């Protein structure tokens, strides 16, 4: 199975039923004969722009339409508690359980100054491409979550 076929199946599963987590999505993929690792699924979700959104009474994985980016931007802004940088990394503190969604939002910009993000429960580490770009990445993130 090619990457494109796998990602198409992921889109179908997410749009066709309520899937609340990557773990649940991994189980759904396995039930239709697609065996992949959690790391591969995580990369696929980031590439597809999949985010975990609250929908009334529970969370669900979703692929937002391009017009929904501003709605997500506003939600992300509420979830971020602080943004700090040292010489090497940008660290974002979030509400508990929201770091993954914030990291996915940052990844969705596909900014060439950012190699990637690493999310825990309430902390996101943003890794700039070079140390010289850390301040620019810090400012980019601030601008990405603010209307100012």
From Swiss-Prot:
GO molecular function: arginine binding; DNA binding; DNA-binding transcription factor activity
Annotated Gene3D superfamilies: 3.30.1360.40, Winged helix-like DNA-binding domain superfamily/Winged helix DNA-binding domain (1.10.10.10)
A Pfam family of this chain: Arg_repressor_C
Cystine bridges: none
Recorded superkingdom: Bacteria
GO CC term, one of those recorded: cytoplasm
Location(s) in or outside the cell: Cytoplasm
Alphabetic keyword roster: Amino-acid biosynthesis, Arginine biosynthesis, Cytoplasm, DNA-binding, Repressor, Transcription, Transcription regulation
GO biological process: L-arginine biosynthetic process; protein complex oligomerization; regulation of arginine biosynthetic process
Main localization (coarse): cytoplasm
UniProt pathway annotation: Amino-acid biosynthesis; L-arginine biosynthesis [regulation]
UniProt-listed HAMAP family: Arg_repressor (MF_00173)
Annotated family: Belongs to the ArgR family.
Functional note: Regulates arginine biosynthesis genes.
Protein name: Arginine repressor
Gene name of this polypeptide: argR
């Amino acid at each position: 199975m090619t990457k494109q076929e796998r990602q198409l199946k992921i889109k179908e599963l997410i749009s066709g039923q309520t899937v609340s987590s990557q773990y649940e999505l991994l189980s759904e993929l396995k039930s239709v004969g697609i065996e992949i690792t959690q790391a591969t699924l995580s990369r696929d979700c980031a590439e597809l722009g999949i985010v975990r959104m609250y929908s009334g009474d529970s969370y669900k994985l979703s692929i937002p339409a391009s017009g929904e980016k501003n709605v997500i931007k506003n939600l992300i802004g509420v979830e971020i508690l602080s943004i700090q940088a040292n010489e090497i990394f940008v660290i974002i503190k979030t509400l508990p359980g929201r770091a993954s969604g914030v990291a996915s939002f940052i990844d969705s910009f596909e900014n060439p100054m950012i190699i990637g993000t690493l999310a825990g429960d309430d902390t996101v580490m943003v890794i700039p491409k070079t140390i010289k770009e850390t301040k620019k990445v810090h400012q980019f993130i601030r601008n990405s979550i603010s209307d100012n």
